[in-house]
Amino acid sequence: MAIGVVLNFEGATLAQYDEVIKLMGLTPRGKGSPGGMFHWVTKTDTGIKVIDVWESREVFEKFAQDQIGPFAEKVGFPNPPVTHFHEVHNYLTGG
């Protein structure tokens, strides 16, 4: 079942996020990671917020352990994310 993931990174910046994306070998508006179905990020008053849809929670958690955590630490994110999961009833993609 698809899962929605909301990650709030308090104190992180979009510049740090861009560095993480580079370390992952991803490019803006390019293809995402295997198992990831949709991804976007925005600046908040206190950091950044990432919103994703993944094939499953297990696929996301492996990706988070293998890439998000290590790369976020490497570029200096000051805090681990506050993460919320949501079961996805439906999603639509561009036509």
Regions found by a protein language model. Give the residues of each.
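Short S/T/G/P-rich N-terminal loop/turn motif that feeds into the first structured element of a domain
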Residues: M1-Q67, G76-G95
